Amino acid sequence: MRHYEVMIILDPSQDERTVAPSLDKFLEIVRKENGTVEKVDIWGKRRLAYPIAKKEEGIYAVVNLTCESATVLELDRVLNLNDSVMRTKVLRGDK
């Protein structure tokens, strides 16, 4: 198993109180495949460096997790299919 860091930018029209429960629903994929979620850090609404889908802001969340590579690929696929997710970036950690 490898360590990964996933950055997720969510639609700013979403209520910030619903971010944690919706992320938890996505992270259930990792838990089902015997992976672990070490940390979920929700940064809140931030200004984007450039517009994405004509939006100037996004809700940032960073997730540190440990899982197999196939699991993180499936998580990225499911996140990209969701309309409330504007952008994702998966980085392999150095743990």
UniProtKB/Swiss-Prot annotation:
* GO biological-process terms attached to the record: translation
Is Secreted there in the keyword field? no
Q: Name one GO cellular component term.
A: cytoplasm
Source organism superkingdom: Bacteria
Alphabetically list the UniProt keywords.
Answer: Ribonucleoprotein, Ribosomal protein, RNA-binding, rRNA-binding
Q: Mind telling me which Pfam families this protein's record contains? A: Ribosomal_S6
Q: Which InterPro entries match?
A: Ribosomal_bS6, Ribosomal_bS6_CS, Ribosomal_bS6_sf, Ribosomal_S6_plastid/chlpt, Transl_elong_EF1B/ribsomal_bS6
Disulfide-bond pairs as recorded: none
Any one GO molecular function term: small ribosomal subunit rRNA binding
Stated role: Binds together with bS18 to 16S ribosomal RNA.
Instruction: State the family it belongs to.
Output: Belongs to the bacterial ribosomal protein bS6 family.
Q: Which PANTHER family match?
A: MITOCHONDRIAL 28S RIBOSOMAL PROTEIN S6, SMALL RIBOSOMAL SUBUNIT PROTEIN BS6M
* Name of the protein described by the UniProt record: Small ribosomal subunit protein bS6
Protein species of origin: Corynebacterium diphtheriae (strain ATCC 700971 / NCTC 13129 / Biotype gravis)
Q: What is the lineage of its organism?
A: Bacteria, Bacillati, Actinomycetota, Actinomycetes, Mycobacteriales
Gene designation: rpsF
